[in-house]
């Protein structure tokens, strides 16, 4: 080794080449530099043009390649290579993926790239390789690049200082809010939804002339997100949040339609899906839920989407409520999603969360800056042109002398200097005169120069006015926005469902309809729409309403709304609650399902009474046992009932609950007895009691085997309907029943004979309702009460339903007629009346 080399090595080793540093501080500094690099140069959009660097470079690269919307398509690979070579020295796949997304109609609300070829699909299919696809700028991109050659934005050196690239685009098109943006930086993320261009322009124009406009005012123009895949937004709570704070969550739901099919089947047709949802994955998820039996009721699933749009068909099984099934799909799949908004963008190279007004104001300020820079550029250019033309005009006005001066000059420099001195011209003017062509000396050209100078002076005056007059600048920007709106504005795609809650409740999509709830003695329950039973004349034989097991009989039925609460009172004195729609829908002849499948009753616990209710805030529950005990409890005591039930009444041995009704607190109570007697007394003679109370005597029985068969309150009607087990009944004015004391035996309400059988129900009615009757064999008849005659107390009534010898009438229910669309069917001898005595004979039994 050369001795000099050894000395150099020693000298190098003696120098400090390793810098000591705290690892904590070094990590902190290095990580912050990396984080800011990601934030500023990669992940977050610039607030003025809504673009990340790679998007801006793709657009500018295509622009410098001449690939505007009016030029032929070029291979995508050529664009990617140009961008990568000059502006973005990173992966070609990153550039191509960016370009692909800007060309997808389901990704961007307003596409910035006009793609030709396979650019992927909403099913998640990848775009074809860049060597196969072609692209160019879209028409709307021209508005983002408009006037970029007029010194409207600053340029910086590219990565190797061989080219210059813009740090922001002029972007007359409000891209940040129109197309939105998403990205994940270090410690922060942005997710800005797209909006409707016409709405944005309306809001921008309002803010242009009303600097102090509130966000509430801007909401009159800008309604909320407008996604390229349309769909529906639930409520405006999330919209209000991010409009005001820049952050919020918007619930987006697929648009669906229900097509009714034969055999009680339906098709649920999905025509729009939430933004950024992969359609193929969505369908696979539904299929998986069906396969694992997490969702039941789907018979078939088809994707019938085509060029016309999305169409996902979900065929239901028989008797499945499509609204409930759809609601289950909303809960379990991406048919409903939450779009978490974070309007984070770069403002002066610093990340900032923007509310709606701030985002719009940044756009407006940017456009003012663009307009001022453009105007200054054009003014400078116009003044330069005017300066030259003024010199040419001077020359043409003194053309002979100018020619003579040039002829006598030694050279061009001498001619230039002589002209400058003689006519007080500038260097540029003198050069322009020397460069004049001979044809410019013609009279017509001289006149044209005068006109051109006048135009330039007018232009200069106009440009100077723009710089001095803010109102003029506002008018120019407003007119430009109107032009953009006229070219590219369109109707809103996403529907905003005001007032809807994003929290999914099964009941929200269940139609409100009148239904019949039937209960057998074994506790089997089922629900059937009232429309399943057609209206008949009284005396009809009816239709099969319920199949039962051999040792089971239909015991009762009630008519209620699908959105009513059902209270089940049991022989243990407990009460349970479910919603009426939770009782499974059955056919007229189905057996139903055991109550134990719906409520948590014990093995030996039996249902005794059903009550439908919608309001617990006022009034009372009035109880009657079969042995005649009564009590009343405030309805509010039952507003909260746990799954395991709640004590409702204390029952004595050998007694059971008969019925519970809702009262106002100041009514009259009518209690019917199986022997044909009825007690009428004031409700308030029974004091309000607690839930665990046993009650007081409401009626005394004439016979040991008597029991309570009817319980009504005066608000239910003015006529008392009495029905017997042999299918006969009548209506009597309630005023024919005199007021008695609580605990009395009552007065006659119907004459009981072997032909009538025991009385099974008394009920106050108005007379314009309909009567639903069910026999011991499950046969149901629906009869207008208008066909039941009004008679005196001591009569036996008329035939209501035809029964065979072994059949008895088991239960009745009254309901108001909301819509009579039923067919009437004749009956056998509907006007048959049984023998009666004088109805006015007083046979009161105290």
UniProtKB/Swiss-Prot annotation:
<dbReference type="InterPro" id="IPR006691">
    <property type="entry name" value="GyrA/parC_rep"/>
</dbReference>
<keyword id="KW-0413">Isomerase</keyword>
<dbReference type="InterPro" id="IPR005743">
    <property type="entry name" value="GyrA"/>
</dbReference>
<comment type="similarity">
    <text>Belongs to the type II topoisomerase GyrA/ParC subunit family.</text>
</comment>
<protein>
    <recommendedName>
        <fullName>DNA gyrase subunit A</fullName>
        <ecNumber>5.6.2.2</ecNumber>
    </recommendedName>
</protein>
<dbReference type="GO" id="GO:0003677">
    <property type="term" value="F:DNA binding"/>
</dbReference>
<dbReference type="Pfam" id="PF00521">
    <property type="entry name" value="DNA_topoisoIV"/>
</dbReference>
<feature type="region of interest" description="Disordered">
    <location>
        <begin position="817"/>
        <end position="846"/>
    </location>
</feature>
<feature type="domain" description="Topo IIA-type catalytic">
    <location>
        <begin position="44"/>
        <end position="509"/>
    </location>
</feature>
<dbReference type="InterPro" id="IPR013757">
    <property type="entry name" value="Topo_IIA_A_a_sf"/>
</dbReference>
<keyword id="KW-0799">Topoisomerase</keyword>
<keyword id="KW-0067">ATP-binding</keyword>
<dbReference type="GO" id="GO:0006265">
    <property type="term" value="P:DNA topological change"/>
</dbReference>
<dbReference type="GO" id="GO:0006261">
    <property type="term" value="P:DNA-templated DNA replication"/>
</dbReference>
<feature type="active site" description="O-(5'-phospho-DNA)-tyrosine intermediate">
    <location>
        <position position="132"/>
    </location>
</feature>
<dbReference type="Pfam" id="PF03989">
    <property type="entry name" value="DNA_gyraseA_C"/>
</dbReference>
<dbReference type="InterPro" id="IPR002205">
    <property type="entry name" value="Topo_IIA_dom_A"/>
</dbReference>
<dbReference type="GO" id="GO:0005694">
    <property type="term" value="C:chromosome"/>
</dbReference>
<dbReference type="GO" id="GO:0005524">
    <property type="term" value="F:ATP binding"/>
</dbReference>
<keyword id="KW-0963">Cytoplasm</keyword>
<comment type="subunit">
    <text>Heterotetramer, composed of two GyrA and two GyrB chains. In the heterotetramer, GyrA contains the active site tyrosine that forms a transient covalent intermediate with DNA, while GyrB binds cofactors and catalyzes ATP hydrolysis.</text>
</comment>
<dbReference type="InterPro" id="IPR013758">
    <property type="entry name" value="Topo_IIA_A/C_ab"/>
</dbReference>
<dbReference type="GO" id="GO:0034335">
    <property type="term" value="F:DNA negative supercoiling activity"/>
</dbReference>
<keyword id="KW-0238">DNA-binding</keyword>
<dbReference type="GO" id="GO:0009330">
    <property type="term" value="C:DNA topoisomerase type II (double strand cut, ATP-hydrolyzing) complex"/>
</dbReference>
<dbReference type="InterPro" id="IPR013760">
    <property type="entry name" value="Topo_IIA-like_dom_sf"/>
</dbReference>
<feature type="compositionally biased region" description="Acidic residues">
    <location>
        <begin position="830"/>
        <end position="846"/>
    </location>
</feature>
<dbReference type="InterPro" id="IPR050220">
    <property type="entry name" value="Type_II_DNA_Topoisomerases"/>
</dbReference>
<feature type="short sequence motif" description="GyrA-box">
    <location>
        <begin position="536"/>
        <end position="542"/>
    </location>
</feature>
<dbReference type="GO" id="GO:0005737">
    <property type="term" value="C:cytoplasm"/>
</dbReference>
<keyword id="KW-0547">Nucleotide-binding</keyword>
<dbReference type="InterPro" id="IPR035516">
    <property type="entry name" value="Gyrase/topoIV_suA_C"/>
</dbReference>
<comment type="function">
    <text>A type II topoisomerase that negatively supercoils closed circular double-stranded (ds) DNA in an ATP-dependent manner to modulate DNA topology and maintain chromosomes in an underwound state. Negative supercoiling favors strand separation, and DNA replication, transcription, recombination and repair, all of which involve strand separation. Also able to catalyze the interconversion of other topological isomers of dsDNA rings, including catenanes and knotted rings. Type II topoisomerases break and join 2 DNA strands simultaneously in an ATP-dependent manner.</text>
</comment>
